[in-house]
Amino acid sequence: MAGAACCFSDEQFREACAELQKPALTGADWQLLVEASGITIYRLLDQPSGLYEYKVFGVLEGCSPALLTDVYMDLDYRKQWDQYVKELYEKESDEQMVAYWEVKYPFPLSNRDYVYTRQRRDLDVDRRKIYVVLAQSISAPQFPEKSGVIRVKQYKQSLAIESDGKKGSRVFMYYFDNPGGQIPSWLINWAAKNGVPNFLKDMVKACQNYHKKT
């Protein structure tokens, strides 16, 4: 994956790998939000925005780390299995690959869209093969804001994946975005407690069907 090397440091990749081995939940007020179906989600209040950062840990059975990472990176395929995607594509901008992503929101809320860059690295850490994908929002004039769609200008995500020692994957995900506008608290709570686990389950199903897509 061609990424914006300038946007992500080696330290950011190392931090994601370290979280996979030992979750960094001390020294801050991380709260356990939900634990179900092998997925555990913690949240931390981001004081400036009043929103939450999230950390997700879990095991996804029946999907190898390499396959899971390939599916996660395949934006064209995601349009087939992610029901919330309205538009998703990637193109070159200022000598780096930039992704555009519009997300469907329930009526009467406006859809949100993201402009972001991402980078994948397949790392060997203490004889462990770890796949890491980092993503963050950027400003790119080639992607002007659309009428009726709210641009998410603060978005950051980390994903680290390794084998669970069987046929599945151990996963760590960090996630934060500021969706802007007035989002009902029930929708924010639903997205955190149900949206993330459901997304991971859908991604496992997508892995199982990945070889059939062509």
From Swiss-Prot:
GO biological process, one term: negative regulation of cold-induced thermogenesis
GO cellular component: a single term: cytosol
GO molecular-function terms, A-Z: phosphatidylcholine binding; phosphatidylcholine transporter activity
Positions of post-translational Phosphoserine modification: 139
Main location: cytoplasm
Domain named START: residues: 1-212
Protein location: Cytoplasm
Pfam families, per the entry: START (PF01852)
N-acetylmethionine modified-residue sites: 1
SMART domains to which the protein is assigned, alphabetical: START
Record keywords, A-Z: Acetylation, Cytoplasm, Lipid transport, Lipid-binding, Phosphoprotein, Transport
Residues reported to bind a 1,2-diacyl-sn-glycero-3-phosphocholine: 72, 78, 157
Tissue spec: Abundant in liver of pups but levels in liver decrease 10-fold about 2 weeks after birth. In adult, highly expressed in epididymis, testis, kidney and bone-marrow derived mast cells.
Function according to Swiss-Prot or TrEMBL: Catalyzes the transfer of phosphatidylcholine between membranes. Binds a single lipid molecule.
Subunit description: Interacts with ACOT13/THEM2.
Protein name according to UniProt: Phosphatidylcholine transfer protein
Organism: Mus musculus
